Amino acid sequence: MESENIISAADKARILAEALPYIRRFSGSVAVIKYGGNAMTEPALKEGFARDVVLLKLVGIHPVIVHGGGPQINAMLEKVGKKGEFVQGMRVTDKEAMDIVEMVLGGHVNKEIVSMINTYGGHAVGVSGRDDHFIKAKKLLIDTPEQNGVDIGQVGTVESIDTGLVKGLIERGCIPVVAPVGVGEKGEAFNINADLVAGKLAEELNAEKLLMMTNIAGVMDKTGNLLTKLTPKRIDELIADGTLYGGMLPKIASAVEAAVNGVKATHIIDGRLPNALLLEIFTDAGIGSMILGGGEDA
């Protein structure tokens, strides 16, 4: 037992030593985190995520959370007898569904995340893109193999982001938690894919990192091997041959756009792993797939 304790202590010391250069490097920087998947639904992972976010803040990194809520939205739609539909990875959202989306994201999911972070010593504040109208949206029309310009309801894309609200929260020492609902020119609500919001917000905040938490290890090739580094050219090839499809498309598109537009590192990581954020940011090997803005695949 004593030797196990010694090994454990040695491992902890090694981990801290490995983390120190990264803490120094990233202190004072912004990390935008897209929070979704199993990490949002499994109690142990939810608690671990909250602790990790608080730790990031304590070591000087400014985490900004953008959350999804697909399973929770689906559950509520099912309760009211509506079936969730998707086109090219985007949720079809009529007026009734939009009311439910906004209620679930802003009224339940956002508040739960805020409360969890605050329970572990953080100072999280929940906001929606309709607050101060800081996320302006326009209707998103989807192109499918069968038809171009398909209208899927109150689904939007980001037209512009005013980062003043989020920056103000960061300056006050708070952790912003953003529900991905935007506002149209007439004040109407738009459901925006959380990956798209996270990517655009990372660009506008000049974030050091964009981290997208998923239910997979990262981007995989057709044989199931993890691709640790990818360029836009390689991603185009993976889309063309059908390796990437469905719900991965908006995630990948957002990651690529962020990388091309100045976010220093964009990552797709496995949110099912305990301490996934810390493993990516504070270890030499990292985890998941890194999207590069250009050049050749490594």
Swiss-Prot record:
EC id: 2.7.2.8
GO biological process terms held by the UniProt record: arginine biosynthetic process via ornithine; L-arginine biosynthetic process
Organism annotation: Neisseria meningitidis serogroup B (strain ATCC BAA-335 / MC58)
Binding site for substrate: 69-70, 91, 191
Matches recorded under Pfam families: AA_kinase
Function: Catalyzes the ATP-dependent phosphorylation of N-acetyl-L-glutamate.
Coiled-coil stretches noted in the UniProt entry, renumbered to this chain: none
Gene this chain is encoded by: argB
Annotated protein name in UniProt: Acetylglutamate kinase
Site entry (Transition state stabilizer), positions: 34, 251
An example Gene Ontology molecular-function term: ATP binding
Cross-referenced PANTHER family: N-ACETYLGLUTAMATE SYNTHASE, N-ACETYLGLUTAMATE SYNTHASE, MITOCHONDRIAL
Family: Belongs to the acetylglutamate kinase family. ArgB subfamily.
Pathway membership, UniProt: Amino-acid biosynthesis; L-arginine biosynthesis; N(2)-acetyl-L-ornithine from L-glutamate: step 2/4
UniProt keyword list: Amino-acid biosynthesis, Arginine biosynthesis, ATP-binding, Cytoplasm, Kinase, Nucleotide-binding, Transferase
Subcellular location: Cytoplasm
Reactions catalysed, as given in the entry: N-acetyl-L-glutamate + ATP = N-acetyl-L-glutamyl 5-phosphate + ADP
Any single GO CC term annotated in Swiss-Prot or TrEMBL for this entry: cytoplasm
